Amino acid sequence: MCGHGDNPACATAIDPKVAAEHGPALAVAGDKFGQGITLAESISIDTLLANPDAYVGKRVRIEGQVDDVCRMRGCWFNLKGDKPGQTMKFKVTDGEMTFPVSAVGKWAVAEGQVRKMPLTLEQTVKVKQHEALEQGQPFDPASVKEPMTIVRLDGLGAVIRDKK
């Protein structure tokens, strides 16, 4: 996964039933990835993050400006939420879809299964270390003091376009 060893945040886990429950792809303008977009309505990233347990395991559609893209494999992108500093990661299995770094600053409509991953302290260190490596930033494992919980969208389809 990701070519990143045993980083727990690199694997996706989409329920086959959730992956199968969709209609035809909608005509959403932009570059299509994976299944494209099949749900007509988006929920806000703010709404999802305010109560992630209500959405865990469900197929949802979100939208936002692409804030960052995996520079190593193109296997994820982050979408900006409604609040400053708020983002939601859209992660796919390596090779299923590859997102270009040029997507940063563009608008994305993304669809997938909401996943919540409570991590141990050791797993949190691995995730933070991997993120620092991807960003070319220094990392001190001692800086991680408590475990984190990741809430993200394991991706089924996306459309990326220049603007909203």
Report residues per predicted region.
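OB-fold and OB-like single-stranded nucleic-acid-recognition modules
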Residues: 1-164
